């Protein structure tokens, strides 16, 4: 069995190598699931929040939405340089940095809300990540996370044969 650090290295390499695939296929209107389901839910849950952290921000589309809703400070973190670079280039007044969910680079009680869209299903150490979220949330803060789940099916849902991974992997895609 591969070591934890070996697994993380392989996983980060996969995300780095395929960042453009994610950006092209799932952001800025390319993915109906984000446009029709996730962004409206995120807007509803995060409206009125002042200081928001977007864990696994990718290109920053949820972060930019939260900023447009009037948040004072929006920070986004992603474990891959390629996503951080694109999020920074797309602007929107965000503070974007490279970090993982298992070691959030923020002081305790820094945020009113933390959001993670389609992220936690990819995190190996969920317990540590949730502990970190709790640490950076202010008392009474809100943690909004969105997960892919086969029970939440929409037209177009089905099994995907992901040929990017070696060996290829099969998973359930919503929408």
Ranges and model annotations:
Residues 127-142:
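A short glycine-rich, Lys/Arg-flanked "PGG" loop and its adjoining helix->strand segment in the class I
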Residues 102-113:
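A short acidic, Gly/Pro-enriched loop at the edge of an enzyme's catalytic core
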Residues 113-126:
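A short SAM/SAH-binding and catalytic strip from SAM-dependent methyltransferases
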Residues 2-47, 61-65, 83-86, 142-175:
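Conserved class I S-adenosyl-L-methionine
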Residues 46-47, 108, 130:
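A short, aliphatic-rich alpha-helical micro-motif
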Residues 49-51:
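Nucleotide donor/acceptor-binding cores
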Residues 53-55, 59-103:
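Class I SAM-dependent methyltransferase SAM/SAH-binding core
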């Amino acid at each position: 069995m591969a070591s934890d650090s070996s697994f993380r290295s392989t996983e980060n390499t996969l995300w780095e190598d395929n960042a453009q695939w994610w950006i092209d296929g799932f952001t800025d209107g390319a993915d109906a699931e984000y446009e029709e389901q996730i962004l409206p839910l995120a807007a509803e849950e995060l409206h009125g929040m002042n200081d928001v952290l977007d864990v696994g921000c990718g290109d920053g589309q949820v972060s930019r939405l939260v900023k447009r809703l009037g948040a004072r400070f929006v920070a986004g973190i992603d474990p891959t340089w390629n996503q951080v670079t694109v999020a920074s280039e797309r602007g929107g007044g965000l503070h974007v940095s490279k970090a993982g969910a298992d070691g959030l680079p923020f002081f305790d009680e820094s945020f009113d809300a933390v959001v993670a869209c389609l992220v936690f299903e990819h995190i190996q150490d969920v317990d540590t990540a949730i502990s970190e979220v709790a640490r950076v949330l202010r008392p009474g803060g809100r943690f909004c996370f969105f997960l892919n789940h086969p029970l939440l099916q929409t037209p177009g849902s089905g099994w995907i044969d992901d040929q990017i991974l070696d060996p290829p992997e099969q998973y359930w895609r919503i929408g």
